[in-house]
């Protein structure tokens, strides 16, 4: 198999340029999307549910299991999962795989945790982070 630009099977080659000679690449095996830290921020949701998803600990901004992606380059980073168990959970959005830049409720830098409830196991939980307002919406279906 081979995947190219925008994660498309047999898609166009992906090319990158760097200004300082160092670049980190990120690949999502599930979506086949590739990006780099030079193309835009790496955004994750760090929260109380991460250990349930296979992260080594909760509240770990470096765990890529909840990597939000902006595949269409519109500034809105999203991820959907059915793996968060039923319950009430909290999270923040972390930028750059650390807590240095993070956004809580109402897009406030270093703001309070954002709470959400998953009503049943297997429900689809979608996170959407708007990089212009720093607000995150959570939809559970």
Kindly give the residue locations of the regions a language model identified:
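Aromatic-rich carbohydrate-binding modules that target alpha-glucans
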Residues: 1-17, 38-86, 96-117
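Fold-core signature of tandem repeat domains
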Residues: 14-16, 23-27, 34-36, 114-118, ...
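A glycine-anchored, Pro-Gly-centered beta-turn/N-cap motif
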Residues: 21, 85-87, 123
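Extracellular/luminal beta-rich ligand-recognition
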Residues: 24-33, 48-50, 106
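Surface-exposed loop/turn motifs at beta-strand-loop junctions within extracellular Ig-like
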Residues: 29, 95-97, 131
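Phox homology (PX) phosphoinositide-binding domain
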Residues: 61, 138-141
């Amino acid at each position: 198999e081979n995947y190219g630009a925008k994660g498309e099977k047999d898609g166009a080659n992906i090319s990158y340029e760097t200004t300082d000679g160092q670049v980190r690449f990120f690949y999502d095996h599930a979506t086949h999307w590739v990006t780099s830290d030079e193309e835009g921020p790496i955004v994750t949701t760090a929260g109380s549910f991460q250990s349930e998803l296979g992260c080594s600990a909760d509240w770990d901004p470096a765990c890529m299991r909840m990597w939000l992606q902006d595949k269409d380059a519109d500034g809105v980073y999203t991820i959907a999962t059915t793996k968060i168990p039923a319950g009430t959970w909290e999270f923040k959005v972390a930028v750059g795989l650390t807590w240095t830049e993070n956004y809580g409720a109402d897009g406030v830098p270093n703001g309070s945790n954002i709470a959400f409830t998953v009503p049943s196991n297997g429900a689809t939980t979608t996170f959407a982070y708007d990089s212009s307002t720093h607000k995150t919406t959570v939809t559970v279906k």
